[in-house]
Amino acid sequence: MAATKRKRRGGFAVQAKKPKRNEIDAEPPAKRHATAEEVEEEERDRIPGPVCKGKWKNKERILIFSSRGINFRTRHLMQDLRMLMPHSKADTKMDRKDKLFVINEVCEMKNCNKCIYFEAKKKQDLYMWLSNSPHGPSAKFLVQNIHTLAELKMTGNCLKGSRPLLSFDPAFDELPHYALLKELLIQIFSTPRYHPKSQPFVDHVFTFTILDNRIWFRNFQIIEEDAALVEIGPRFVLNLIKIFQGSFGGPTLYENPHYQSPNMHRRVIRSITAAKYREKQQVKDVQKLRKKEPKTLLPHDPTADVFVTPAEEKPIEIQWVKPEPKVDLKARKKRIYKRQRKMKQRMDSGKTK
């Protein structure tokens, strides 16, 4: 018996479906041309994102935070620095009881290799630590003359996330401790190239100037037309205290001989005011003693009356009659007014009866 062929279900061969006609091809040519123009307009109006032509290699991350007890101006300064530095990270305030070397562990947890730490003391003194975590070096500064962005209200402006230029005073290359600070400031304040949060623009410049043994920080906008500079802010002055070999500690590499602590400065001011007060009191005591001293009578000098001309003597008149009293017109008018008022009241009372 020959093997029978199995028939397909239904006994009919399955035919392939014809491809549907494209909807765009089905439209008339005029309508098709209008849709193409709309697509071109949408593509023209769309703003493309920043094109990254390289790889992000410099993985510098900066941790910016502070201790407890800072005032509003320090908090605003921290926010301004975080806004100007897209490669920065934030953290909660650190307790005063914790030691400074704990910050290295915080940087490790946050995956940061640089740190800007603001330390407040006595609710009036502000110190800034710039550190390369965890191996160092680190520098401690006293922050003075703080002016934030909201406080200055300058006319300059820059794009958020743009990369800055760094301008340093020529004095940074003259002394070794300034050269070390220059390298530390470059690694902290320069935004890495091709950073994900940065923009591929350079429209502002950070300037670090040395004057009066202090570092003055300024932020300027670069105007495209004539390359002029317009200040943006913030402003602050860094007074160097010490440079340490390690991160937040270790052997001292440099100590500023011109530095004067805020406590000593306030003490000098108090001593000057106290000296002025003591001087005033001594002057008053001397004046009192001079007043108590007996006055020395000088002998009469006959030459003092040479140019004195005696005045004519007036005859003395004796008044035997008592002068007439002066008439007070105001009192007289007042008495007449009272008399007339009483008479009017009597007449009115008589009419009523």
From Swiss-Prot:
This is Ribosome biogenesis protein BRX1 homolog. SUPFAM superfamilies: Class II aaRS ABD-related. Gene3D superfamilies: Probable brix-domain ribosomal biogenesis protein. Residues 21-36 have a biased composition (Basic and acidic residues). Required for biogenesis of the 60S ribosomal subunit. SMART domains: Brix (SM00879). Belongs to the BRX1 family. GO terms for biological process: ribosomal large subunit assembly; rRNA processing. GO terms for cellular component: chromosome; nucleolus. The lineage of its organism: Eukaryota, Metazoa, Chordata, Craniata, Vertebrata. Its main location: nucleus. The modification Phosphoserine is found at residue 261. Residues 1-46 are annotated as: Disordered. Pfam families: Brix (PF04427).
